[in-house]
Amino acid sequence: MKTVEIFISGRVQKVGFRACVKRIATELNVTGTVRNLPGGRVHVYATGELMILEKFVSMVYGCPRVLIRDLRQSEIPLKKFDDFSIIKREGVSVQGFKFTAVS
């Protein structure tokens, strides 16, 4: 298991990108979070097997209405998540539960 931190820029906000990322993560059994950042970027934590994470990143490029101009990823210390959540604002997921990343 590995965790990657991903920063994505381009036309990635207000186009359904976070929902698309969550759908792909759920299909691939990847856990983590996705959230919008100030300045129009998106931040993702993704945890899974290396081959699956590579597929996850490649599938993200196929989200409709999205134009990815830059995607930077780096491996970070393992973070464990129960599922994959869209973070609406700092510390609160779509379901309204506070997320806690365990490292």
Language-model features and meaning:
Residues 1-103:
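Intrinsically disordered, low-complexity, mixed-charge
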